[in-house]
Amino acid sequence: MAASDEVNLIESRTVVPLNTWVLISNFKVAYNILRRPDGTFNRHLAEYLDRKVTANANPVDGVFSFDVLIDRRINLLSRVYRPAYADQEQPPSILDLEKPVDGDIVPVILFFHGGSFAHSSANSAIYDTLCRRLVGLCKCVVVSVNYRRAPENPYPCAYDDGWIALNWVNSRSWLKSKKDSKVHIFLAGDSSGGNIAHNVALRAGESGIDVLGNILLNPMFGGNERTESEKSLDGKYFVTVRDRDWYWKAFLPEGEDREHPACNPFSPRGKSLEGVSFPKSLVVVAGLDLIRDWQLAYAEGLKKAGQEVKLMHLEKATVGFYLLPNNNHFHNVMDEISAFVNAEC
């Protein structure tokens, strides 16, 4: 190991809780193995290394889940998480899975997992746990989308899958709240999932589907310019500029650069959000994330366009801090997400 790598390793361990450090470090090792220099990806090995869990109709921590095929044509699955019924003495039957929601207003979070468009899935253990936590915190239903991944399925496949999932959620009668017979939808995601949430929200505004809010955790944005955070944090806390460049090349249309609107939504080629129907946003930025400056620029772009945005800039947080409840940043963000969702419900 090079001396500079040793310094970065030691420094990251002084900032990151040990179990988070182990988790993210293991991801980094696996990710480095899976990416190939020619732009291809070892999907077979990726699936083998990704620890997955099955849906569970027997409530776990007060939440039960089931998988639904929402588009047979592209084999698009989603995992639905629901609070256990208060009066339920037996495990839910197949007839209970799509039982109308219980409550005057029940928020529904459409969730997109992270992984830089290439890694993880809706049934990855870390995201299964996160979605269960969101159900408990927000007293909501969560629909986690198993979108198609790059490089096999580049832009705009993930956005198309998110759009299909949004329409599916919006059309489910059993997700409609009793008070107004509407589905109270929020979009959420981390890393690439936050990027997908933004782009699905754009389509929703154009189509008239009402989305109440966007929740973006360390959203993955970028651009051609090398920002201060990319220069100063390159390789320091798990992620390198070269890593990020590989993922953008894998996802973006062939021949495109990082000024493409999928990467840089407020570039000259991006869609103006001034006067556009767009949900209010909660943008969470980890100060030690390599692409911090792009995330801050995204929040500022929303503000300049006249859109409502709340920014949480956690200066000493790193990527993945929200995956384990072992730090104050985790608890503060979860409380903020709960308040953000329930303020509209």
UniProtKB/Swiss-Prot annotation:
Tissue expression summary: Widely expressed.
Cellular location(s): Nucleus
Disulfide bonds: none
Motif Involved in the stabilization of the negatively charged intermediate by the formation of the oxyanion hole positions after renumbering to this chain: 113-115
Taxonomic lineage of the native organism: Eukaryota, Viridiplantae, Streptophyta, Embryophyta, Tracheophyta
GO molecular function terms noted in the UniProt entry: gibberellin binding; hydrolase activity
Name recorded for this polypeptide: Gibberellin receptor GID1A
Gene transcribed to yield this protein: GID1A
Subcellular location, principal: nucleus
Pfam families given in the database record: Abhydrolase_3 (PF07859)
Species whose genome carries this gene: Arabidopsis thaliana (Mouse-ear cress)
Matching InterPro entries: AB_hydrolase_3, AB_hydrolase_fold, Carboxylest/Gibb_receptor, Lipase_GDXG_HIS_AS, Lipase_GDXG_put_SER_AS
The protein's enzyme class: hydrolase
Summary of the knockout phenotype: No visible phenotype under normal growth condition.
Positions annotated to bind gibberellin A4: G115, S116, Y127, S191, G320
Family, similarity comment: Belongs to the 'GDXG' lipolytic enzyme family.
